[in-house]
Amino acid sequence: MRRWHTVSKNRQLKEAKVAEIKEKMEKAECIVLADYQGLTVEEATELRKKMREEGVEYKVFKNTLSILAAKELGYEGITDLFQGPISIAFGYEDPTAPARILNDFAKDHKKLELKGGMVQGEVYDEDKIKALAAIPPRDVLIAKLLGSFKAPVSNFAYLINAIKEKKESEEA
């Protein structure tokens, strides 16, 4: 009787963990998987800090539970990536942030290896994740866009002012 209670309790804990993973996967704009084997505790702590600063959640779950959650959501394509020690970065606001942070960190820490991920339901392999990492953050893109709108208006205003000054000098 005592053994049955323990098994039931373990099952409840696992079901709760699968539900938690599913919720994070559903909520995330971008999910990036990385093999973290070989990172020191200090390196892992540094990576987690960088993730937090960018609003990215960085977690390690049992692969079997992550696979169950992915399958329940219909994310079959991502399940093959869960091999070995895998960490998951969940990007909720900026879909490029998890890829960018992990890619930059992997450049200096060769033991961290990008595996792939998922962006808005589409599976990305390692190369696509690296391409995503090259895209500037959302704020930078918006600033560039606004700057490109501002430049023609500024040039036009400069042109109008030059015409006005030319006419004034001709009248004088």
Curated annotation (Swiss-Prot):
A Gene Ontology cellular-component term: ribonucleoprotein complex
SUPFAM superfamilies documented for this protein: Ribosomal protein L10-like
GO biological process per UniProt: translation
Protein keywords: Ribonucleoprotein, Ribosomal protein, RNA-binding, rRNA-binding
Keyword Heme among UniProt keywords: no
GO molecular function, one term: large ribosomal subunit rRNA binding
One Pfam family it belongs to: Ribosomal_L10
Coiled-coil regions listed in the entry: none
Similarity comment: family membership: Belongs to the universal ribosomal protein uL10 family.
Protein purpose: Forms part of the ribosomal stalk, playing a central role in the interaction of the ribosome with GTP-bound translation factors.
Quaternary structure annotation from Swiss-Prot or TrEMBL: Part of the ribosomal stalk of the 50S ribosomal subunit. The N-terminus interacts with L11 and the large rRNA to form the base of the stalk. The C-terminus forms an elongated spine to which L12 dimers bind in a sequential fashion forming a multimeric L10(L12)X complex.
Name of the molecule in the record: Large ribosomal subunit protein uL10
Source species: Clostridium tetani (strain Massachusetts / E88)
Taxon lineage: Bacteria, Bacillati, Bacillota, Clostridia, Eubacteriales
